[in-house]
Amino acid sequence: MAEETQHNKLAAAKKKLKEYWQKNSPRVPAGANRNRKTNGSIPEKATSGGCQPPRDSATGFHREGPTSSATLKDLESPCQERAVVLDSRSVEISQLKNTIKSLKQQKKQVEHQLEEEKKANNKKQKAKRVLEVQIQTLNIQKEELNTDLYHMKRSLRYFEEKSKDLAVRLQHSLQRKGELESVLSNVMATQKKKANQLSSRSKARTEWKLEQSMREEALLKVQLTQLKESFQQVQLERDEYSEHLKGERARWQQRMRKMSQEICTLKKEKQQDMRRVEKLERSLSKLKNQMAEPLPPEPPAVPSEVELQHLRKELERVAGELQAQVKKNQRISLLNQRQEERIQEQEERLRKQEERIQEQHKSLQQLAKPQSVFEEPNNENKNALQLEQQVKELQEKLGEEHLEAASQQNQQLTAQLSLMALPGEGHGEHLDSEGEEAPQPMPSVPEDLESREAMSSFMDHLKEKADLSELVKKELCFIHHWRDRRHQKTHHLLSEPGGCAKDAALGGGHHQAGAQGGDEGEAAGAAADGIAAYSNYNNGHRKFLAAAHNPADEPGPGAPAPQELGAADKHGDLREVSLTSSAQGEAREDPLLDKPTAQPIVQDHKEHPGLGSNCCVPLFCWAWLPRRRR
């Protein structure tokens, strides 16, 4: 652009210069041209200023006479005209020189302006390039900002949705909190009522209950010490087994090293045998070629039979070595094949075990959390709850390697504690286990079985799992034994008051107690009342299970009619019958039986049918018996 403007300016300056020259160019007058044509050589003479030398003028004057003056006049006029023309031309030349100087100055100015314009254009181009680069960077920054804005909008939407979800959850939790608070208030009200009822009992009954609770506390302490001793024994066995596993691990590592060394030696022997076979094949081919070559026409000497026999023996020996080597290679290949088959079988077993443990891990994740119970324990069953807590801690320490056995143990403990708890509380504590088999977590099977460390760690892990499962089984056996001992002790305590328990169970508790005197009669009557109440409690438990098996509208096959329940309420002075009937009514009307929390009770009754029909009376239920009226 700058060059084009410069060329245009130069062209305009040239045009102006041409116009100026055309305007100021000198024009010769027409009279002067005529004088040049008519006079011939007269203008040449006039070049000397129109003056002739005196010699010529004198000669002319003398020669021509009167005509010389006329010619002189005629010559003076063009000379004067030419002088005027020359003066005008000199003036024009000076003017032209001035104009040329002015034009040169203008040209210099124009060139200087062009250079300045070039510099300005270069600066503008540089600035333009810088601006283009800045525009590109701004566009890139704009795109980045747009992407950041898009991501920020997405994250904002995500956080808004999350906040909405959290608000909904908070609302549900608040609702649940209100429900739980209402349930807790109801429970507290029932507990207050029960406390008021218990406060109306006699002082002797409370003292007797305290004695019984102290006995139970002593028994539970003994059992707790036994559990601690068993736990210490289990820890010692675990340490011994860990040492045994370390020795087994070292032995397995040594065996793996030996196997790897044997494999390396077999590979080396195989390579050496292959080389020997190649050498023998080459020697055999050479011997065959030597035997196949035709005899020369004139042999220098016929080979003897001894040499031929020697060659045959050599050939047979080479063939025998070759066959032996082939057989050896076949045996090595068979050994390698068998070893590969064994490794594949081990991998298949490990894969099946991995799948089994993965299935168990999936079922473990489906377990539900235990249902929280909002009942404050009384002074009588605090020790039992502490025992349950210690058993849970022991179960957590043993781990979740065999959760099926641990769940059975927990169910048995909760059943025992529910038998030991007060039957009037209605609900009792139970775990909300959803169910099914609880698999042990799957150990990750190492893919690279050839690595010694992975194989040894995998075998160590499997043995630890087996050890833990055995420990859980031993703990279950111990708990079963403890449960049987508890039943025997309760039977023994029931049979202590002098053989009156049987008659009292049949309904004669009041009369038998009246026959005796003092505290013995009171204890016997309490035992009779406890047996009758517990029999009614067992009947109510069976009815509850029957109602759980059957629908809510249909009564169970062994469930009595409501009239029978009302009659049972009127029989005697026992309040526990009304509690069992109310428990049955709740079992029929309660919609929670359709929920998973009521299913483990029915499942426990199916798996252990002896729990509902056991006639042992827990000692804590005597604390709930009404005072016998004398």
Curated annotation (Swiss-Prot):
Record keywords: Coiled coil
Basic and acidic residues bias locations: 352-362
Pfam families per the UniProt record, alphabetical: GM130_C, GOLGA2L5
CC annotations in GO: cis-Golgi network; Golgi cis cisterna; Golgi cisterna membrane
Coiled coil: 86-148, 224-411
Superkingdom, natural source: Eukaryota
InterPro entries with a match to the protein in the record: GM130_C, GOLGA_cons_dom, Golgin_A
Gene Ontology biological-process entries: Golgi organization
Disulfide bond positions: none
Region (Disordered): 1-76, 352-379, 424-444
Family designation: Belongs to the GOLGA8 family.
Protein name per UniProt: Golgin subfamily A member 8K
Organism: Homo sapiens
Source lineage: Eukaryota, Metazoa, Chordata, Craniata, Vertebrata
Gene of this entry: GOLGA8K
